[in-house]
Amino acid sequence: MKITILSGGTGTPKLIQGFKEILPNEDISVIVNTGEDTYIGDIYLSPDIDTVLYTFSDLINDETWYGLKGDTFFCHEQLKNFGFDEVLKIGDKDRALKMHKASSLKNGVKMSEIVDIERKSLLINSKIYPMSNEKVESKVLIEENNEKILLKFHDFWIFRKGNAKVLDIFYENSNYAKAANGVLKAIHESDFVLIGPSNPITSIGPILSISEIKNALKEKLVFAVSPIVGENPVSGPAGTLMNAKGYPVSAVGVYEYYKDIVDVLVLDNSDINKKKDINCEVLYANTIMKTIDDKINLARNILDYYKSR
């Protein structure tokens, strides 16, 4: 059985940990959001790609879901001594991965090729693809002192900690972007596609904003795991951003966002009362993943449901 997973950088990697324990890793492909990618100085941040790489290689710092566990921060501290205070604390080994991306991009190497080099160097058997080799950037329109300001998502979330009145979210350049090498083939060859429990607006939305990808998904069986339980996001600013796009912060809002492509919506057991407002198949399970057993059980529930259809 082959599956393709659409992933951001927090919720979905937890579920990936479950799938990689119960499926041959070579049968898992992941298409990753790059809408938050940005340069900081001479390094290139691709936070969701890096988190997925570290998740598959069992190196992820699963307390922060960012960076490497056990990393050191000598470079970060030395930069502070020079007056260059990085808002995002980047570890030394993690910095090497980001330097590799920056150098490769400046030398004209495509992002899909860069990620594949890194995947192989980390001895990962699963395939990992950036959503596009072209720059698609998530932008957040906020209002501050009666003035509208357009921010990179990185600036909104890291610098401002998400503390702003959000008016809208855009995916800059998505109208012109193409799916990265291998993405459409992975979708076509998979038995089903899984949209993981990442932020629908800024983790999955950028992927779906590429028309080639969304059109390919319409031809496949698609599962989607809701990242919202009750009326609360499991993590991150999903609630604020869904409100800004006009969707209710609930499982119903997640369904409305994905309704053009989703066939099976995976909801937490506590959301059983939401079924009447959802016009697709619903699988109920424990979607709060605190332990490795939780992650494996959710992955297994999804696979069992697929096999029973």
From Swiss-Prot:
Reactions listed under catalytic activity: (2S)-lactyl-2-diphospho-5'-guanosine + 7,8-didemethyl-8-hydroxy-5-deazariboflavin = oxidized coenzyme F420-0 + GMP + H(+)
Keywords assigned: Magnesium, Transferase
Cofactors, names only: Mg(2+)
Record's keyword annotation contains Ribonucleoprotein: no
GO molecular function: LPPG:FO 2-phospho-L-lactate transferase activity; magnesium ion binding
Family the entry assigns: Belongs to the CofD family.
Protein name: 2-phospho-L-lactate transferase
Originating species: Methanococcus maripaludis (strain C7 / ATCC BAA-1331)
Taxonomic path: Archaea, Methanobacteriati, Methanobacteriota, Methanomada group, Methanococci
Gene label: cofD
